[in-house]
Design a protein with these regions (language model features):
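Short internal beta-strands
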Residues: 16-22, 133-134, 221-222
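A conserved nucleotide-sugar
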Residues: 13-15, 211-222
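Conserved nucleotide-sugar phosphate-binding/catalytic loop shared by glycosyltransferases and other
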Residues: 14-62, 69
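Short hydrophobic segments within beta-strands
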Residues: 19-21, 108, 192
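PLP-dependent amino-acid enzyme catalytic core
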Residues: 11, 45, 57-64, 68, ...
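Active-site and donor-binding regions of nucleotide-sugar-utilizing enzymes
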Residues: 1-9, 49-151
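A nucleotide-sugar donor-handling region in carbohydrate enzymes
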Residues: 24-27, 130-205
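Charged helix-capping and loop-helix junction motifs
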Residues: 119-121, 173, 203-211
Length: 222
């Protein structure tokens, strides 16, 4: 959101207010709110919500804490509109609180699908509490409309992350090898894992299955 935030901040007719929350405020995850400040933005409010546990009980409590924190923030900041992106549970808390304050919500990246995860339910709930919708593809625009949103309020604008890619200074291979201490001397594969949060199989077991499959590929560096 940094590029869009910059455009809002530079517009003389608009006032940007930033609320930082969740992992941005956690030492365990690097206190990344500092990255926001290093880009020259002022954080107007920090909403503490993250409990140091990944259980269902802790996550539910974190959502409750976030809803309280965002309510307090809206009471003080009195925003005219809330701009949110995606399907994180802290965003669900933010728009839930905004609903009762009658704050219009602009939602980016609605209508998308993440199979096997809580994300779909959260994302669609955010859509139903939002007033303006900016989707990354025409297919997702149609899905938002299928959820009952007014077509004239749903806009296919593309993925906002593309703007960031266009402005990134890419590292060359040698510099990247030095920074990662990882030689690219043969075919290399970057592997990421997104757990299926709705699956009855524990996440650890799912991940072990992935590692076992990768063990069979001795011809590549992972």
């Amino acid at each position: 959101l940094s590029g869009l935030a910059r455009k809002i901040a530079d517009d003389p007719e608009l006032e940007l207010q930033i609320i930082a929350t969740n992992m941005h405020l956690s030492p365990e995850f690097g206190l990344t709110y500092r990255e926001i400040e290093r880009q020259g933005f002022r954080i107007n409010r920090k909403v503490e919500m993250l409990l140091s546990s990944d259980t269902a009980n802790a996550t539910g409590k974190s959502v409750g804490l976030a809803t309280i924190g965002f309510s307090d923030a809206y009471e003080d900041l009195a925003p005219d509109m809330l701009l949110v992106l995606g399907d994180r549970y802290e965003i669900l808390a933010a728009v839930t609180a905004a609903l009762f304050y009658k704050i219009p919500v602009a939602h980016l990246h609605g209508g998308e699908v993440t199979e096997g995860a809580y994300d779909d339910a959260i994302r669609h709930a955010i859509t139903k509490m939002s007033h303006l919708h900016f989707t990354s593809t025409e297919e997702y625009r149609r899905r938002v409309i299928q959820l009952g949103e007014q077509p004239e309020r749903v806009f296919h604008v593309g993925a906002i992350g593309i703007d960031n890619i266009r402005h990134i200074d890419l590292l060359d291979k040698k510099v990247l090898e030095e920074q990662l201490d990882f030689p690219f001397d043969r075919k290399t594969v970057l592997v990421t894992y997104h757990p299926e949060t709705l699956d009855a199989i524990p996440t650890g077991e799912q991940f072990r299955n992935l590692l076992e499959a990768l063990d069979d590929r001795q011809d590549i560096r992972i």
